[in-house]
Amino acid sequence: MKIIEGNLSLKGDEKIAIINARFNHIITDRLVEGAKDAFLRHGGKEENLSLILVPGAFEIPFALKQACESKKFDGICCVGAVIRGSTPHFDYVAAETTKGIASVGLGANVPVSFGVLTTDTLEQAIERAGSKAGNKGFEAMLTVVEMLNLIQKIKA
């Protein structure tokens, strides 16, 4: 059986976008730094990395759709942070952001990763943005890198 699997190495000419929700920027700035770090560590060049800023997580799917349609990017890494509050707002934003990214991602012709934190507390978000639980922005970028490689191997 032939196994087709991506790896974590970039050629250096891949153009990648990070879409970042500014809301909860104390968390999302760390996710962006993690994503950028992963991109550079695995062979990407900073001049090939674009940062698209949106107001909040709910706006990520629309920006993602526009970025995919532009055909300027080989892959797109989505990051944000939705932290539960005392109202049901969290449930709506988290669910619709997730559905929107998944929907656009399935229709895209480029890899799209989901690095949007959905946590119950600020402490949980901090843990996932570079402290105890690693950096989910870094992990989301690794997903883009691996999927780029996988697509190239599938098409070869």
From Swiss-Prot:
EC number(s) on file: 2.5.1.78
Positions of (2S)-2-hydroxy-3-oxobutyl phosphate binding: 86-87, 128
Domain of life: Bacteria
GO cellular component, one term: cytosol
Binding site for 5-amino-6-(D-ribitylamino)uracil: 23, 57-59, 81-83, 114
Pathway of action: Cofactor biosynthesis; riboflavin biosynthesis; riboflavin from 2-hydroxy-3-oxobutyl phosphate and 5-amino-6-(D-ribitylamino)uracil: step 1/2
Pfam families xrefs: DMRL_synthase
GO molecular function: 6,7-dimethyl-8-ribityllumazine synthase activity
GO biological process, one term: riboflavin biosynthetic process
Residues at the active site: 89
Keywords annotated in UniProt: Riboflavin biosynthesis, Transferase
UniProt key word Transferase: yes
Catalytic reaction annotation: (2S)-2-hydroxy-3-oxobutyl phosphate + 5-amino-6-(D-ribitylamino)uracil = 6,7-dimethyl-8-(1-D-ribityl)lumazine + phosphate + 2 H2O + H(+)
Record's function text: Catalyzes the formation of 6,7-dimethyl-8-ribityllumazine by condensation of 5-amino-6-(D-ribitylamino)uracil with 3,4-dihydroxy-2-butanone 4-phosphate. This is the penultimate step in the biosynthesis of riboflavin.
NCBIfam families recorded: lumazine-synth, PRK00061.1-4
Family affiliation: Belongs to the DMRL synthase family.
Protein name listed in UniProt: 6,7-dimethyl-8-ribityllumazine synthase
UniProt organism field: Campylobacter lari (strain RM2100 / D67 / ATCC BAA-1060)
Gene: ribH
